[in-house]
Amino acid sequence: MAPRPKAPPQPAEPDPALPRPRGRPPKAGAVTAGWVGLDFTRERALYADGRAPVAGADEVGRGPLAGPVVAAAVVLDPARVPQGLDDSKKLTRAKRESLYLEICATAEVAIALAPPERIDRDNIRQATLWALANAVRGLPCRPAFLLVDGNDPPRVDCEVEAIVGGDGLVASIAAASIVAKVVRDRLMAGVGAAFPAYGFERHMGYGTREHGAALKAHGPCLHHRRSFAPVREQQLGLFPAPGELEEAD
């Protein structure tokens, strides 16, 4: 039987994992020659053309069997661009955490989550686009231009450029990828504490051997994406009714 959660995470409540973003959005013409980090050629051209603010957006969590898709949108301050920005997957956890705090302290940041229920209802593509669009809409400032990773951009009320591999090329997108990755990892660590039998804090919901064994032993929990084939295959007679769950140690 699957263990009963000790206490389900409440992402809507104030959480130290999500420090309040600070900083002012850049203004047109604010670009300087002293920018550091990834290639700012694209942003520099946009600011020089008077299209400000420029936002970057990215998501994390399309592939896992459990947990939300987390999307982030970031408007970097050209005068305070963090050094060392890169694709979040290329950074160590310690470096991501350090950059995350710096981004939140110096940039405008917004986050949106597409939970498993929305993923199952709408499909992963539509849920991801929904999260990206909501992250952009949640920015304190309305961007004039959006740079987004990939080739499938969301519908938003500004001009958009999709860049394949953008999280490793464009600083604004890299910053968004770091924010999304850190937020999702922290959320999944909380889910792991509530559902210790699944090891979410180690595999973050991805389809690892450990996760597959836990699914086979316990069936899906409420954080699993039931429309995903490996989870769907475990639902036939394996998932206990709500009153049958046992208390976790």
Curated annotation (Swiss-Prot):
GO MF terms held by the record: manganese ion binding; RNA binding; RNA-DNA hybrid ribonuclease activity
Hydrolase keyword on record: yes
Cofactor(s) this protein cannot do without: Mn(2+); Mg(2+)
Family matches, as Gene3D superfamilies: Ribonuclease H-like superfamily/Ribonuclease H
Chain positions recorded as a divalent metal cation binding sites: D58, E59, D149
Coiled coil: none
Domain RNase H type-2: 52-240
Region (Disordered): 1-31
Catalysed conversion reaction: Endonucleolytic cleavage to 5'-phosphomonoester
Keyword tRNA processing included in the entry's annotation: no
Bias-annotated ranges (Pro residues): 1-19
Biological role stated in the UniProt entry: Endonuclease that specifically degrades the RNA of RNA-DNA hybrids.
UniProt family annotation: Belongs to the RNase HII family.
UniProt-recorded name of the protein: Ribonuclease HII
Organism of derivation: Xanthobacter autotrophicus (strain ATCC BAA-1158 / Py2)
Primary gene name: rnhB
